[in-house]
Design a protein with these regions (language model features):
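ATP-dependent adenylation/nucleotidyltransferase module used to activate substrates
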Residues: 1-161
Length: 161
């Protein structure tokens, strides 16, 4: 069993192998650890990207902005309204797939336009326990999940911040 220190080292090593990376940054604990690790490894070549949406609390976006400003981390915001997606509004069991697909289409498009080869998001191993239809969208876009790769559970994430 890996120690928390080993997991943190694996996470930072993963980012060290990249020339640059966009981090999908909500401001939650998972994406905060992910961004902090990416920034430690890549410096200005780690870019935080936050989706500002009507269905996300404004306080989350404000917290994400504040975190990046306090640490001088490059940060971009993309506005998006999932309520414009008919598939999402129909409220099927897999509505998260449609929302994630639309969100990561925008994030990956941003990365491509800015010649950033990697996009990372903050899923951890405990997320596998839940029904997560949005995971399919991440796979379709080739989005990486370094916390999962480094075997982080939610308790590891909280203990690392």
């Amino acid at each position: 069993m890996q120690s928390q220190a080993d997991k943190l080292l694996a996470l930072k090593n993963r980012f060290s192998q990249m020339p640059s990376c966009v981090i999908a940054f909500s401001g939650g604990v998972d994406s905060t650890l992910l961004l902090a690790s990416a920034h430690d490894a890549l410096g200005k070549n780690a870019l935080a990207l936050t989706i500002r949406a009507s269905v996300f609390p404004k306080s989350e976006t404000d917290g994400a902005i504040r975190f990046c400003q306090e640490r001088a981390i490059r940060h971009e915001i993309i506005d998006f309204d999932p309520l414009e997606l008919s598939e999402f509004c129909a409220n099927p069991p897999n509505r998260c797939y449609y929302c994630k697909k639309a969100i990561f289409a925008r994030i990956c498009n941003f990365a491509q336009k800015n010649s950033i080869p990697f996009v990372a998001e903050g899923s951890n191993l405990d997320d596998d326990k839940d029904f997560r239809p949005g995971r399919k969208a991440l796979e379709e876009f080739g989005v990486i999940s370094p916390l999962r790769e480094a075997q982080f559970r939610k308790s590891d994430v909280r203990g690392s911040l």
